[in-house]
Amino acid sequence: QGPWMEEEEAAYGWMDF
């Protein structure tokens, strides 16, 4: 988990989903 919870769409960009 990280600071990407706020922006689900944009955050997943740098995540390994």
Swiss-Prot record:
Entry-annotated residues carrying Pyrrolidone carboxylic acid: Q1
Residue ranges crossing the lipid bilayer per the database entry: none
Function text: Gastrin stimulates the stomach mucosa to produce and secrete hydrochloric acid and the pancreas to secrete its digestive enzymes. It also stimulates smooth muscle contraction and increases blood circulation and water secretion in the stomach and intestine.
GO BP annotations, alphabetical order: response to food
Protein name in UniProt: Gastrin
Record-listed Phenylalanine amide modification sites: F17
GO MF entry, a single one: hormone activity
Assigned GO CC terms: extracellular space
Keywords in alphabetical order: Amidation, Hormone, Pyrrolidone carboxylic acid, Secreted, Sulfation
Residues bearing the modification Sulfotyrosine: Y12
Family recorded in the similarity comment: Belongs to the gastrin/cholecystokinin family.
Main localisation: secreted
Post-translational modification: Sulfation enhances proteolytic processing, and blocks peptide degradation. Levels of sulfation differ between proteolytically-cleaved gastrins and between tissues.
Subcellular location: Secreted
Superkingdom: Eukaryota
Originating organism: Macaca mulatta
The keyword Secreted is annotated on this UniProt entry: yes
